[in-house]
Every structure is written in structure tokens, then in C-alpha cells.
Amino acid sequence: MLGLDTPHDHHGGARRGRNTVRQFTFGALRVVHMGDIGCVPDETTLAALRGCDALLIPVGGYYTVGAEEALAIAESIAPRCIVPMHYRGEGFGFDVLGTVGEFTALFDAASVHTLGGDTFTLTADAPRGVIVPRLLHFV
């Protein structure tokens, strides 16, 4: 596992502290979890993550990057699949967060794969694009 230190905000971490981006390697598969990233990372960080198989990235904004910045990060890293996280949905999430639809609307509809369940298996032949699992939430 690789951990990369990044600021959590646009002020070098002065407002929200630091964030750790984690890269996990499972055989030939690389999975990147962006944590609570709140700004576009520097080029050195982006280069270390480039070409990963799966990118888990917040898209809801306010506490983290929003849809547009998440897209910019994803385009720079160029993962095989993107899994959005930290957003508001029907019946869950903070009112200040954007929805997953605000992020997926930035992509061609054919590249957005909405799942019927909350899990999927990442394989070498998994579909490219945005993977949106059905989220479980508790009231």
C-alpha cells in the first residue's frame, strides 16, 4: 500500500488539515482511494496514480472536491473505472453535498454503470467508466 499526503483544502491544509490518498495493489490491479481530497493534487501526486484500475473519489463538494474538480482529477489520472463517493442521495447525506447525478451528468450516459447492488468485482475485463453501486444507508 502506498500513502500520499495531500492537503484537504485549497489552502494547503490550513482549514481542514491533511488528507492521505491510498493506493492498493492486488496482483496486477491498482485501486486508488482519494480519501477526503478537497482540492486537485499536485502533478507529482497525480503522476503516481495515473493509469490505476479503479479510482474511488469524493464528488459531493463542500467538505471535499465537487463534481467538476473530481472530473478534472479523474481525467488526469485516467483510471479504467471511477467509483464516486461522499455525495448526497435520496434519504441520506448532508444538504450541503451535491448528488452523484451532478457528477455522472458530466459523462456520456453509456459510460455510467448503475449497479443493482452494493458490490462489484473488479477484474481485468470490468467495464470502463463510472461505476455507481446502490448504497446501503440506515435511518
Predicted feature residues:
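Glycine-rich loops and low-complexity Gly/Arg-rich segments
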Residues: 24-27, 48-49, 57-59, 80-83, ...
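Short histidine/acidic/glycine/proline-rich micro-motifs that form metal-
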Residues: 8, 61-62, 88-93
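Core dinuclear metal-dependent hydrolase active-site scaffold
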Residues: 1-50, 54, 62-68, 115-139
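Charged helix-capping and loop-helix junction motifs
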Residues: 16-17, 50, 66-78, 96-100
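Proline-aspartate-enriched helix->loop->beta-strand connector
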Residues: 53-57, 61, 67-88
